[in-house]
From Swiss-Prot:
Its EC number is 2.1.1.-. The gene is prmA. GO terms for molecular function: protein-lysine N-methyltransferase activity. Signal peptide: none annotated. InterPro entries: Ribosomal_L11_MeTrfase_PrmA, Ribosomal_PrmA_MeTrfase, SAM-dependent_MTases_sf. It holds the Pfam family PrmA. This is Ribosomal protein L11 methyltransferase. It comes from Rhizobium leguminosarum bv. trifolii (strain WSM2304). One of its GO terms (biological process) is methylation. It comes from the Bacteria.
Amino acid sequence: MSEIRLYVTTTESKAEEILDLLSAVFGEEDFAIGTTEIDEKEDIWEASIYMMAEDEAEVHSRVEDALKASFPNARLEREVIPDVDWVVKSLEGLKPVRAGRFLVHGSHDRDKVRPGDIAIEIDAGQAFGTGHHGTTAGCLEAIDAVVRSRPVRNALDLGTGSGVLAIAVRKLKNIPVLATDIDPIATRVAAENVRRNGIASGIVTRTAPGFHSTAFSEHGPFDLIIANILARPLIRMAPKLATHLAPGGSVILSGILATQRWKVIAAYSGARLRHVRTIWRNGWVTIHFDRP
């Protein structure tokens, strides 16, 4: 069944207001809600809510009612998102990736695992994160370093995608991990990958559209938070993210172009975190902070 996106095109400030409105209307219901920048120069943004086709009629009606009350001039638009399993045909071209002690590989490369490898099996699919992108590999390297160097008892993988980073933490250390994403398809894919890697009992996967989700208060605070998203949302969420970090905890951030690193470092320094290390990979950076 196809997924449906309902969205409003507007400015950044109004998109954030609509995001807050929809989050209040739908609360803990299993619908992904988010904002996306379309054109930075022209200040064009979209506020979106995602649902399966069977839920569209009810969700559409509730969204329209909410918008009429607060944003009477907003135009609600619709997009059908095809249920496509991408890159599967190119699996043979995806080679295993090494990062720290980890080897991320597809099911077709199980024979490449060597003694001593911490193997994570992830096939290309509908969610980001097979280890081939510099941001994922940088996060894996940082996770390995953090878990080696300090106690970690409770972890959060924010924007989990394929679940590869949550799986990495759990395979390194027998601790609880919360893996969240705004996209229910990504959450489902992550749960499937967790089961594939034989560690389903240690990782909780949740669809959570923002920090107002009760998932974070139920499972936190966390002494390791990993967020491989994009620089702009990482900068915006710095104050809220920091409130979920336990004393002495670590934060690993990626999805950041090298040219954007100073803005991210400034935002998290402003949230009273200390910049520890920056890992560079193919024009992208992964940044490690801790709470002194």
